[in-house]
């Protein structure tokens, strides 16, 4: 999708208030709890036996932080998401064989986490811009499959 100046402003201003470490851990943690089949990509992460184990797992938190950090890079390059994610796409698709559907799920979980954290500030308009953003990221990450 094409990002309007308004989309960019909306995404950037909310992103400035996001605690990448906290929100990253929560987003990846929720992904693994809500969509348990995604856990198979994280065999090396140790204890994922329950929701509380997952949410407290330091490796989940660390990778979640990494995920949102790369999302922050993307936010600086909304007009070239494909270029921004070329290497990550190669890694996740060619080497790890992650189903692209999982990128979409992660994006939806992130939107949920932002909604919880920002409450009323996360208006329908803000949600629309973010949904466009996570869809763009998912499709950029999946580009190796086409």
Curated annotation (Swiss-Prot):
GO molecular function: haptoglobin binding; heme binding; hemoglobin alpha binding; metal ion binding; organic acid binding; oxygen binding; oxygen carrier activity; peroxidase activity
GO cellular component: blood microparticle; haptoglobin-hemoglobin complex; hemoglobin complex
Superkingdom: Eukaryota
Disulfide bonds: none
Organism (species): Macaca nemestrina (Pig-tailed macaque)
Tissues expressing this chain: Red blood cells.
Keyword Mitochondrion: no
Function in brief: Gamma chains make up the fetal hemoglobin F, in combination with alpha chains.
Note: The gamma-slow sequence is shown. The residues responsible for the gamma-fast sequence are not known.
Family indicated by similarity: Belongs to the globin family.
Pfam families per record: Globin (PF00042)
Protein name as it appears in the record: Hemoglobin subunit gamma
Annotated keywords: Heme, Iron, Metal-binding, Oxygen transport, Transport
Residues that, per the record, bind heme b: 63, 92
Known partners and oligomeric status: Heterotetramer of two alpha chains and two gamma chains in fetal hemoglobin (Hb F).
Domain annotation Globin: ranges: 2-146
An individual GO BP term: hydrogen peroxide catabolic process
């Amino acid at each position: 999708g094409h990002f309007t100046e308004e989309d960019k402003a909306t995404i950037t201003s909310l992103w400035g208030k996001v605690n990448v470490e906290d929100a990253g851990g929560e987003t990846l943690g929720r992904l693994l709890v809500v969509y348990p089949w995604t856990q198979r990509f994280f065999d090396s992460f140790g204890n994922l036996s329950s929701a509380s184990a997952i949410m407290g797992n330091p490796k989940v938190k660390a990778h979640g932080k990494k995920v949102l950090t790369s999302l922050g890079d993307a936010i600086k390059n909304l007009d070239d998401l494909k270029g921004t994610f070329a290497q990550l796409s190669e890694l996740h698709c060619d080497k790890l064989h992650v189903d692209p559907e999982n990128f979409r799920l992660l994006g939806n979980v992130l939107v949920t986490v932002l909604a919880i954290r920002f409450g009323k500030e996360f208006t329908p308009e803000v949600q629309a811009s973010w949904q466009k953003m996570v869809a763009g990221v998912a499709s950029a990450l999946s580009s190796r499959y086409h």
